[in-house]
Amino acid sequence: VKATIENIRIAEQDRSYNSYVLAQKAGQAFPSIFTDYWHYHPEIEITYIVKGKGLAFIGNKTIEFEPGQAFLLGPYLPHNFVSTEEEDVQMEKECWGLQFTQEWLNSFKESASLQRLFRAMSYGINLGQFNPAEHQAFTTIVGKDPLRSIGAFFNLMAMIADRPDFLTVSTNNAYSNVMSQKLSRRMERVSKYIQDHY
């Protein structure tokens, strides 16, 4: 089974990008917000894990994630976040996301300073724990004030771009729109195994 392409439809939103908050209380029934959904999309994505832990499947690598951790995923990079808690239903989970196109960001001349970031994100970047300023920026982005949100968006991008180096995740960059069928089937089996046994 191949990774599924996700249709985000940013043009239908009331902003130039899509932001979301997914939350699940302890004791809430399945499906989990961290579930078996191996997918990719043409948009860049920042995923911020506020609560919960598990495994992140990014490109051809698997790494653990925990509360406070964030990832920057380039266009067409297959990914999936899966909860590994044995008592998953008892665990609070919350994930914030931000999705936007590289074309939109490139429409600003000021984004020229982000080229180093663009190259690295095609492999997926493990941003580690967000610091308080980054957390505050993301809080504003997912808020309801569009003007403050767009300002916080560019502030967050600048803080990420200012990092001295980036911890990339995958050894393969964003595959030419569709990953190999062999790797896709393998990741699907691994993801299913984790869902069935943890």
Spans of features found by a protein language model:
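Generic protein-terminus/edge-of-domain signal
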Residues: 1-66
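Active-site-flanking beta-strand signature of metal-NTP-handling nucleotidyl enzymes
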Residues: 48, 96-98
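Short, charged/polar surface micro-motifs in flexible loops or helix N-caps
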Residues: 52-53, 76-79, 101-105
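Conserved metal-binding segment of the jelly-roll/cupin
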Residues: 58, 65-85
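Residue-level recognition of the GNAT/N-acetyltransferase active site
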Residues: 59, 101, 195
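Ligand-binding loop in jelly-roll beta-barrel domains
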Residues: 76-96, 109
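Amphipathic alpha-helical segments enriched in hydrophobic/aromatic residues interleaved with Lys/Arg
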Residues: 102-157
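Short, Lys/Arg-enriched, Trp-marked, Pro/Gly-tolerant hinge/linker segments that flank
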Residues: 125-129, 142-197
